[in-house]
């Protein structure tokens, strides 16, 4: 069974920075597989914001400009939706994303 929707959750910008730096090849393969299967991808990052990413307000040594460029490039390359939130709301958001994605596909007749 191919996934139709995936939510990639990261606990903060430092974890996401590690994916773009040390684990980039593995992270890239995951996104390429999902994209090849027509999967919609949502990247949910807790305890973060675009402002924190752009301004380098995280512990990682990854350059803020490079980090921002990678995030933007992946949004375009993999048609990825980025969601920033507090950790208290991540469970609810994941549920809503999965529910709304499936509901939209059903209403559009993607399943019979």
Give the residues covered by each predicted segment.
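Non-catalytic C-terminal interaction segments of nucleic acid-processing enzymes
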Residues: 1-3, 14-112
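Conserved catalytic cores of phosphodiester-cleaving nucleases, focusing on short active-site segments
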Residues: 5-11
